[in-house]
């Protein structure tokens, strides 16, 4: 997945990573290595609030990143997200940022991400982000759209 994002982000890497920074509520990012370091260090719970304030509904967060009950438990103990939860948060931030670049509009990107696609057997691109393999398929479609290869 990193290779495909890298191809697209070569045009404006600073802007691409800035979008991800804002969504995750983290310090400056310059590369995928920085994202890997974030996952390894485990993202703070504030990341969930940041994603929520940037277009993800509570239900999407509970479904795709961390279950509601687990989140409540983590908040009470002031624990960070796990590595897996951090990885899912980064995955969603990367793909939603890429969609915003491709469509040039946050609202259009959000609608596209939530609309079922025949290509994904009736699932939405957002649903596909549950797995790394699904995220690669979504990323591939976004890049094809960006370069005029997909309808």
Residue ranges of predicted features:
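Non-transmembrane "mature" sequence context
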Residues: 1-151
């Amino acid at each position: 997945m990193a290779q495909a994002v890298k191809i697209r982000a070569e045009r404006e890497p600073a802007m691409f990573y800035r979008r991800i920074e804002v969504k995750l509520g983290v310090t400056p990012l310059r590369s995928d290595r920085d994202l890997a370091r974030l996952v390894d260090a485990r993202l703070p719970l504030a990341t969930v609030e940041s994603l929520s304030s940037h277009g993800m509904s509570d239900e999407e967060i509970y479904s795709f990143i961390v279950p509601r009950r687990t989140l409540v438990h983590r908040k009470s103990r002031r624990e960070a997200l796990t590595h897996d939860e951090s990885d899912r948060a980064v995955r969603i931030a990367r793909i939603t940022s890429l969609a915003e670049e491709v469509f040039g509009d946050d609202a259009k990107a959000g609608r596209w991400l939530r609309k079922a696609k025949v290509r994904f057997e009736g699932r939405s691109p957002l649903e596909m982000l549950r797995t790394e393999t699904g995220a690669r398929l979504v990323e591939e479609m976004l890049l094809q759209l960006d370069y005029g290869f997909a309808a």
